[in-house]
Every structure is written in structure tokens, then in C-alpha cells.
């Protein structure tokens, strides 16, 4: 699991998926801070993504670099400590250029519930599935040539 979390630290620009009217909505987002299996983000209450998150807090993110990817799902929570909000604002060079103060933004945490790590470089490719709710980790292979039981 640590390999997948480290990948997210190095690849902080992610595809961020929400839902509106039963239709997927996808955009690029930056992971602003990590704390174990919790990822922190910031946005504006004026953006559609904020309304989408309030209506349905279930999200997925995807980070990709070449043949390696990490996909996470979970629910967002807007209850973020003020200390974290200030840190995010102070440590992101883009936010002060766009907003006059840290309190002009809304911050939210994504507590990872499910995470998949894919590495298509080796043969057979690697798949690690982490269900943090159940506390389980499973592995597998990608592709019919590597399915268990096949000869």
C-alpha cells in the first residue's frame, strides 16, 4: 500500500471524478496535502464541483504516469482543521495568486476507502487492490493470459 501512497505524493495532479444528474464529471485537481490515507483538496464554493460534492460526496481519483496508475475511491468530508487549511493555502503557490485569503476557499478531505495500484511494466502485470474499509489487500493479474487456473 505504501508504494501506491508514495506514487500519489509524487503525482499530485489527478483526474477527479464526481457525478451530477447521474452523469460523470471529470476534471484535473491537485492533491494539496497527504496525511496517511487521507488526501486534502481545496476549491471554491462558486465552482460546480463544490455543488456536486455537497450533493454526492462519493468520488474517484486517478493518477497516471506511463504504465503505472493508482485509482482511489471514497467520500469527501468538509470538516478540515483550520491548521490544515492555512498550511494548504500557504504551501501552494497557485492559491495566493487566485484568492486573497485562505478563508476564501473551501477545503475537503478524501479518506481513501478503496485503492488500486496497477503496474503494467512487468510480465505479468501487477494489480494490488486495497479495501481500507475491510482492511484487506488482494492481488491479481491483468489479462486473460495470466488468469489463475488457465493453462
Task: Label the model's feature ranges.
Residues 1-2, 43, 91-93:
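Charged, amphipathic alpha-helical segments
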Residues 23, 68, 122:
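Residue-level detector of flexible, active-site-proximal loop/helix-junction positions
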Residues 32-33, 75-79, 122-124:
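A short, sequence-level motif marking secondary-structure junctions
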Amino acid at each position: 500500500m505504501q508504494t501506491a501512497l508514495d506514487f500519489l505524493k509524487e503525482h499530485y495532479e489527478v483526474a477527479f471524478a464526481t457525478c451530477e444528474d447521474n452523469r460523470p464529471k471529470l476534471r484535473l485537481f491537485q492533491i494539496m496535502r497527504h496525511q496517511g490515507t487521507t488526501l486534502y483538496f481545496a476549491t471554491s464554493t462558486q465552482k460546480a464541483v463544490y455543488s456536486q460534492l455537497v450533493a454526492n460526496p462519493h468520488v474517484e481519483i486517478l493518477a497516471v504516469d506511463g504504465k503505472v496508475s493508482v485509482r482511489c475511491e471514497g467520500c469527501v468530508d468538509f470538516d478540515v482543521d483550520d491548521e490544515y487549511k492555512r498550511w494548504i493555502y500557504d504551501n501552494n503557490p497557485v492559491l495566493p495568486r487566485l484568492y486573497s485569503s485562505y478563508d476564501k476557499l473551501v477545503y475537503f478531505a478524501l479518506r481513501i476507502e478503496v485503492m488500486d495500484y496497477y503496474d503494467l511494466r512487468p510480465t505479468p502485470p501487477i494489480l494490488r487492490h486495497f479495501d481500507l474499509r475491510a482492511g484487506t489487500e488482494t492481488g491479481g493479474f491483468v489479462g486473460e493470459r495470466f488468469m489463475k487456473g488457465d493453462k
